[in-house]
Amino acid sequence: MNIATTPVAPDQAPFRIGLGEVTGAVADLGVMVPLATALILVNGLDAGAVLVCAGLLVVATGLVFRVPFPVQPLKALTVVAVAQQLSPGVIHAAGLEIAAVLLLLSIRHVADVVARVFTKPVVRALQLGVGVLLVVTSIKLVLNPPEIFSGTPAAPWPWILMIVAFVGMVVAARTRHYWVALGVLALGAAATATSASPHVGGPSFSLPDLQIPAAGAFASAFFLLVVPQLPLTFGNAVVAVNDLAHEYLGAAAARVSPSRVCLSAGIGNTVSGLLGGMPMCHGAGGLTAHIRLGARSAGMNMLLGASLLLLGLFFTAQVVVILGMLPVWGLAAFLAYAGLRHAWLVSDLRGVDLVLAVVAGALGAWFANLAITAGLALLVVHGRRVISPRAGNLEA
């Protein structure tokens, strides 16, 4: 089975907007909406700042890379921050520290050199782990929907609707009739709005304020949030997303490199950390979600980024209500489909490399910590090369 899509021709319009860009834009919201909402509701981040900073980075990456490119919350960091109910200052300090590391890696192509350590089995192990976690997240969304999804029907309807929506995703992706996926989501949103009857209210313009974290926040941020996040960020949101961009998009992704991805995420997190947004990355799972649901140009970024900016600038007070109108079972279906396709990328490995990737990816997914995946895969791959140089030469 060919895991890659047909590469995008480099002479195609990089900013066109079609139905595939629309469905691709919403394909990764199953990750962004719950995580961003948790940071807003539990940790007290400003909703407008979160969406404005995310929208700016989404638009900027589209303009820079000229292909559909993902922007996601930093997952490991968000999970720890929410679980420990850390203050906005600590979260913003962590974003600035991660930005500093990524900017250092972008200097003189340091990231391109470091990326060579992440060989194909290591990257595939991370992709498998991310894919499994996406599927698990989709199941948890339906099993225990966040409170913002107020119009969710009683069981077993969410499971039935998720399965129907998942089949719709498969049909849409295989036939390239992306209106099927968009129609499923639109009908679900309409049904949710009808049953919940949310009060949205009118628009009001607001801009994020400059927020400088206190000096004492940086030490806590580094040990609690940055240390567990960095291996996953570099492995999945730098090396793996670069690998997938070239695999999925061919010559159209010529502007994408590990150093440029580090620079993009570094600048984005600097702005976000100073304006009160959330820490973000370019997760490889998000790229699979966008591509598999139809996005083929940076028009997807323009569409998604403009939508986030519109919400963040004019509907700050209503953000949670508006996002809660999306059908949780529809988002879960998008997430499950993207996760399965992302995990399936491991299928092009053979022999010992396949076993390594599956074991490392499965362990990371089991413990919900992909730093374990990265560490184990790196240790085994490069340990084999030290013990048996011949094995390393054959792999290379």
State each model region's role.
Residues 23-24, 58-68, 172-173, 228-232, ...:
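Transmembrane alpha-helix interface/packing and boundary motifs in multi-pass membrane proteins
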Residues 85-199, 303-396:
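Membrane-embedded alpha-helical modules
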Residues 30-33, 186, 190, 199-203, ...:
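Juxtamembrane interface elements at the cytosolic ends of transmembrane helices
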Residues 31-38, 54-58, 75-80, 161-169, ...:
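Hydrophobic, membrane-inserted alpha-helices
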Residues 2-19, 39-60, 227-298:
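Membrane-embedded helical hairpins/re-entrant loop segments and their flanking transmembrane helices
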Residues 30-36, 70-77, 238-240, 277-286, ...:
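Transmembrane helix boundary and interhelical junction motifs in multipass membrane proteins
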Residues 19-20, 27, 155-165, 194-197, ...:
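Hydrophobic, membrane-embedded alpha-helices of multi-pass small-molecule transporters
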